[in-house]
Amino acid sequence: MKKSLIIWTLTAASVFLLSAVINPAFSASKPPVVIGFIGSFNSDSGKSTLRGAEIAIEELNAKGGILGGRQIKLVKADTAEDVTEGIKAYEYLNEQEKVDFIISGSIDDVSLGWMPRMAEYRTPTLDTWTSAISAIEKVRDEYEKYKMYFMNCPTDYALGTQYVDFGKDVLAKKMNWKTAVIMQEDTAYGAGTYEFIKGDILDTAGINMLDHIVYDVNTVDFSPIYNKIIQTKPDFIYLISSVKCVVPTSQYVKLQVPIPITGINVAAVGKEFWKDTGGMGGGMSTLMPPPTLGMDMDPRTEAFIKKYQAEYKDRPVFPHFNGFNAYYGIYNAVSAAERAGGFKPLDAWVKEMENEDLKLYKDGQLWLRYAYWKPGEVEPRTGMTFPHNVKFDITPPLNDGHPSLIVIQWYTDGTVKCVYPPKYANGEFTIPPWIKK
């Protein structure tokens, strides 16, 4: 990374001071604004948030800094995707680094773990990866306690609504599929998602579940599982996979399972998916918050991607959705601070953050939007409030806010396209060529 950043590292076990590169731009008369990153150092998702933040900070520093010419100093702390380490990391950023603002790439459980400490420190914080509705419910139910918290990934509720729409519009209506087997990993995430898929997507779309298969994440031979599914003769397989996703995917292609597959495959959102599967990822589709791989992008986001790919040569070579969220989230937070006169007093910053509205246009139409639901503001389709969540739009034709969900599909030639919703689709939802129509 460029040496305009000062980076401190927190390991999973304890805090160690590794290095400090002094930038003469940090003058005594203008102390730096300290932004802290909290997330996993060793995961593709954690690196995506960190890199998105780094690029935004580099751009802002190159333009002369913020708040009257102060440079931004970035410090970071590793959660190791562990709740206890995440709490320690949040404490470290506040007590040792004295941060002004925190950008988070934490997973759900970790964010929920450090939120009580956030409420004590009163530190402005933006989450970019988690979609936990319970985090936004904390803001809604105890606003004064949690008002410093914002999330620019749509919540589970918004994602779920679009899951249902995809089931009705594509799986049931377009494909005319009426039966499914749910193939679910044996994890807490898998179990919770299964309940939602069965109760909301399949039932609402009028699709009958013929079987429910739970597999161990360490399974290496999926042929017995796929053979069982073939004997059941469903119209399609709904896969729920967030851990070791490559194995069931590559074996699906290798075995040329004669049944279409869709669902949730977390690995499929990465540019490395094709290489990781040995070129056997064709036919797999997955649901993912935007912006994401496979989408057409607006000009500003395209410029960010080019800068990212020029600067980072190791994985992830293409930012995950939270990398984009971190990039634009830094701009949101800094813009609010400029109008508020800083990140303190907290109330002034929160008010201006609630007024943030960063709109991105493509070919004259609103493409992405980084604004936030205000306290008491009602989302029209659900009739619910989502204070401080990104202002998502779940009402077709999706012309008012941030889309909550994109469905992408990998094809057998190694390309990946967006197939849903219609506004963003640049490809068609298809079945693999070895399956008879």
Language model features with spans:
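Extracytoplasmic "Venus flytrap"
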Residues: 36-54, 77-84, 106-107, 183-192, ...
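Extracytoplasmic ligand/sensor domains, especially the bilobed periplasmic-binding protein
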Residues: 99-212, 260-286
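Beta-alpha junction/loop-to-helix N-cap segments that form part of ligand/metal-binding clefts
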Residues: 30-32, 45-51, 64-140, 152, ...
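Extracellular/periplasmic periplasmic-binding protein-like sensory domains
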Residues: 132, 153-156, 252-328, 338-340, ...
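Segments of small-molecule ligand-sensing domains
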Residues: 310-320, 334-419
